[in-house]
Amino acid sequence: NQGRAVKFFAEQVEKASGGKMRVRAIGSAALGPDTQMQQALIGGAQEMMVGSTATLVGVAPQMALWDTPFLINNTREADALLDGPVGDKVKAALEPKGMVGLAYWENGFRNLTNNKHPVAKLEDMSGIKLRVMQNNVFLDSFKALGANAVPLPFSELFTALETRAVDGQENPYNTIVSSKFYEVQKYLTVTNHVYSPWIVTVSKKWWDQLSAAEKKVLQEAAVKSREFERKDTREEAAKALADLKQKGMQVNELSVADANRMREKLTSVHSTVASGVG
């Protein structure tokens, strides 16, 4: 669905600029992983990207706020937080580092899959070898919950699950479906433990060369595409969960009481994020 949103964004840009501005989309990580593209934006070799906020922590530590487990309970809260002054403040932290944030899109609420057993309570996390993003908040969070957290690039994840190098992973439903993790994972626990945004960013070197009118076209197109992308992502997520059940994954939902027990285990992680974000 990210591809559909980029196409929508490109159409908005072309339309609003009267055909003077055109967006060429390059998908499937053809320009490298997020971290490589970030450096290309900072250096001015690439103009724009849509990527995970979690991979931007190395550029702007404030982005770690969005990795905080159990920070956001539902999409209404997510929209209010990301599109309000807090979201703007976190976005603004990118500018001194050479990037400009235009809008937050939605990746979705992350949920847990594994091959060992259903995770219904905190104790069930113990001993699960779980792939996490190469990000300290994710690493520290799952260690605190008792899992054996293994940082791995996303591109290596399917093979790691298939060969049982790791037992499980955590991602939004749409990613679990599109990456076919249901082929190599048996259990899905609805944890909604982290709300993951995407962010549309541009190279500051390039941005500073644009006219005020050109900047306005891009900014407004990013906001319009945000609304399109969120609606699309939420519709797809509902379908994806039904699809995963149909494909044979055993699905259980973490109770509120057990989610609260996990939240209590994460107080030190929350404190670390708070001091890092400021």
Residues covered by each model-derived region:
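N-terminal secretory/targeting leader peptides
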Residues: 1-77, 85-88, 92-278
